[in-house]
Amino acid sequence: MLVFGPNSSFVRHANKKQEDSSIMNEPNGLMDPVLSTTNVSATSSNDNSANNSISSPEYTFGQFSMDSPHRTDATNTPILTATTNTTANNSLMNLKDTASLATNWKWKNSNNAQFVNDGEKQSSNANGKKNGGDKIYSSVATPQALNDELKNLEQLEKVFSPMNPINDSHFNENIELSPHQHATSPKTNLLEAEPSIYSNLFLDARLPNNANSTTGLNDNDYNLDDTNNDNTNSMQSILEDFVSSEEALKFMPDAGRDARRYSEVVTSSFPSMTDSRNSISHSIEFWNLNHKNSSNSKPTQQIIPEGTATTERRGSTISPTTTINNSNPNFKLLDHDVSQALSGYSMDFSKDSGITKPKSISSSLNRISHSSSTTRQQRASLPLIHDIESFANDSVMANPLSDSASFLSEENEDDAFGALNYNSLDATTMSAFDNNVDPFNILKSSPAQDQQFIKPSMMLSDNASAAAKLATSGVDNITPTPAFQRRSYDISMNSSFKILPTSQAHHAAQHHQQQPTKQATVSPNTRRRKSSSVTLSPTISHNNNNGKVPVQPRKRKSITTIDPNNYDKNKPFKCKDCEKAFRRSEHLKRHIRSVHSTERPFACMFCEKKFSRSDNLSQHLKTHKKHGDF
């Protein structure tokens, strides 16, 4: 039993155990326990667990000290104490009632008023009542009065606490107390004592079948789920009162203009966050927009070709803009552009040959923007026109030859035009440009036929020509001959070759940089193939010889022609057995060897097969490699 004296200081004493059977009865303070019998042993049981090797500390409350198994006051007088019990799980000191001892206690205060507890024992059913009918006198310093004050404080704490603790009706008589719990007197009914919110009941002390507990408690009667269930039910009731998303949609203002229905809520009020894919299709669904209300002023996102008011970009396929018109023809145009973009993957470029001249610059730009949807996006793309006003006012740019040539020949390997190379323009070319020249007559040439590229497999054989090695690997990989020099060739319509030195082409490029307002700069075409160090600058020469429009080198194996009449003139290598003509001698040699001749110079080293072309041999060697021959 824990009692409090008038002294507020706590004096710590050494752990002294004395085996004196006689206890001195001298008044040393306000309350001194006096043993009324003389045949009681001064030693009491001390039950310690095997896992706990730390002895119970000794504290002095007022002039009384608490130790296991003896207590001494301030004068080191041994006083019989209550039995202490320490468990290994929580190392808490368990205080048993002194009523279980078969001793008689005398309590005296400073006024010599004695109240005697005459050999009373509490019953095992925890009723908190004595067997005898002795009259009990309580003092202010008794634990009963202190417990009353503590209970009043707990009532105040319950009022201001956020969650009121619930009485546990299954508390046992011998509750294990933590150091933060208040001690109760042996006369107090423990069932009526409410647990404090600052109680430190450890979970292992409340669990049933505690192997380290030696107090003989019936822990099976404990119920730890009452408070948790009540708290869970209260929290669930709060969550059920939460307004769902369906009810929240009823209070949203109805715009009245958008007839799109809301998505049905099929999940709970708190959807799972793991189901989100963060996809754009969940937030933007332009195919579900309302198309019936043409007078709707609400801006919607559409994908249309840009007109003359926006800056054209090379190789751009679609350009999302914001418009007000939601009529059906725009969406028909969108479907047409999508189908046109998809048809571009079939590599059928014959439809570009039938382009007619438009009546205005704006319509020509629209036609160019529509045809640009069939091209792929370039690796290095820059705006073609930087200044719209200079484009509209400049007489040189009034002829849309440069735009049509750059848009219609971006990715077409067999088209009639290449990207414009303004770096090789000179002043005479720009000044002599005539507006009366019809640029779209050039577009009426038929597409090139029978154009075959040299594959890298030609390099497998030593019989391949030097031109084939030059076309596939570049000049850097072979030794150039003295006659092979860096020159800039001018290929005109009359099939005459004019050799322009490199210094003159460089001078024309420097002169072009001095006139930035006459033309727009175009980024060079970035190709995946290895570029040759020979600079080829084929230019288009018109019949009236008014000007020349240079074309950027295409970095490909064949040179395209423009005029159908001069189509065969650029193919000087004609086959003697048929009507086909070729631009390069190795192409003619390959044609004769594979079609008209039985020559098979490429033989397989693993079998007896021979081939007329090295690429066929390399394809055949793959079958041997698959079978594990090498």
From Swiss-Prot:
Domain of life: Eukaryota
Region (Disordered): 37-77, 115-137, 292-322, 360-379, 502-566
First and last residues of each zinc finger (C2H2-type): 573-596, 602-624
Post-translational modification N-acetylmethionine, affected residues: M1
Subcellular compartments: Cytoplasm; Nucleus
Keyword terms, alphabetized: Acetylation, Activator, Cytoplasm, DNA-binding, Metal-binding, Nucleus, Phosphoprotein, Repeat, Transcription, Transcription regulation, Zinc, Zinc-finger
Segments of skewed composition (Low complexity): 37-56, 360-373, 504-515
Polar residues composition bias: residue spans: 292-303, 516-525, 532-547
Pfam families: zf-C2H2 (PF00096)
GO molecular function: cis-regulatory region sequence-specific DNA binding; DNA-binding transcription factor activity, RNA polymerase II-specific; zinc ion binding
GO cellular component entries: cytosol; nucleus
InterPro entries: Zinc_finger (IPR050331), Znf_C2H2_sf (IPR036236), Znf_C2H2_type (IPR013087)
Residue numbers of Phosphoserine PTMs: S178, S263, S316, S319, S558
GO process annotations (BP): cellular hypotonic response; cellular response to alkaline pH; cellular response to amino acid starvation; cellular response to arsenic-containing substance; cellular response to cold; cellular response to ethanol; cellular response to freezing; cellular response to glucose starvation
Short sequence motif named 9aaTAD, residue ranges: 237-245
Role played: Positive transcriptional factor that acts as a component of the stress responsive system. Recognizes and binds to the stress response element (STRE) which is involved in the response to various forms of stress (heat, oxidative, osmotic, etc.). Involved in the regulation of the CTT1, DDR2, HSP12 genes.
UniProt remark on domains: The 9aaTAD motif (residues 237 to 245) is a transactivation domain present in a large number of yeast and animal transcription factors.
Protein name: Zinc finger protein MSN4
Gene name in the database record: MSN4
